[in-house]
Amino acid sequence: MSPPAHGSDAKPPPQWAGLKSISSVHEATIHAAVLALLPDPATVRNCLDIAEDAARAVHGTMAAAHIGADPERMIAAPEEVDLQILRDMNEDSPSQRFERIAGAFADWKRVSPDRESLLLDDCRGDLSRCVTAECHETALVVAPCHGNMDARDAFYDLLFREHKLVLVPPPDAYTGNLLAHVVIGWKPHEHAQRAVVAARRWLVAADRITVLCINDKADGSYQRTARELLDQLGLEGEVVAISSGGRSVGETILDFARSATATCLLIGAFKHGYLLELLLGRVTRHLLSHSKLPLMMKH
């Protein structure tokens, strides 16, 4: 399989000033604290807005990268290449998708002079290779979970191949105050613990943290382990235990988040595996489908 292609050596058009794809841009991208991954033109602004907030909250660097599957730049089975070519009929060609993303990125940059130094990396070819190339070293990746095929495939790779901490933008316009009140959905399982540990840098910066324990055991093990983890990580937060009643756990989390005026949710994602969650509609799938808040997660 050939390595992913990073842009070209040609000088970008004037309207794309700042969109150079050179080794220095890629180097800055892979070492950023927060990466806005841009596979879908429809979610560019939300991803960039929330990534900017996430980076600013921890006094870290931000980067932005376009990734896209391109059958002309990949070595793959004929069926995969045919699928990508067929997909172009519905979603435009790889170059057209990049042009739309680059244009949206340039529009976003023009809003604030503070964004002038931010450049857009570009990786096209085999999508999994591009995800690895752009995201492997990044602490937090902001990426959509829905949208075009690139967005859906990249989201899967981020969680299950790269095991990244992923921040999914809300479906509507992002309104700011990312870390005003972070609600953590907690069960004493490894995937939930990994998510909290990975997000510690952002939890330290949060104004308020609530750890939500739903349907705790009789011995109070959910609440006890939640307090222990907060202590181990040097975090201050409230631990709340509630019953789901007749609701699903996903519904209960969202109802609580609304009542508590949460600004971000943090969960351990897909405890039962991706396919089982898709088939049975478990907690992660429900939150991804119905949450109006930014959703931070790690598998």
Name the predicted role of every residue range.
Residues 149-157, 161-173, 190-201:
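Active-site glycine-rich loop that binds ribose-phosphate moieties when present
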Residues 66, 145, 268-270, 299:
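Short secondary-structure boundary segments
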Residues 84-100:
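A short acidic, glycine-rich active-site loop
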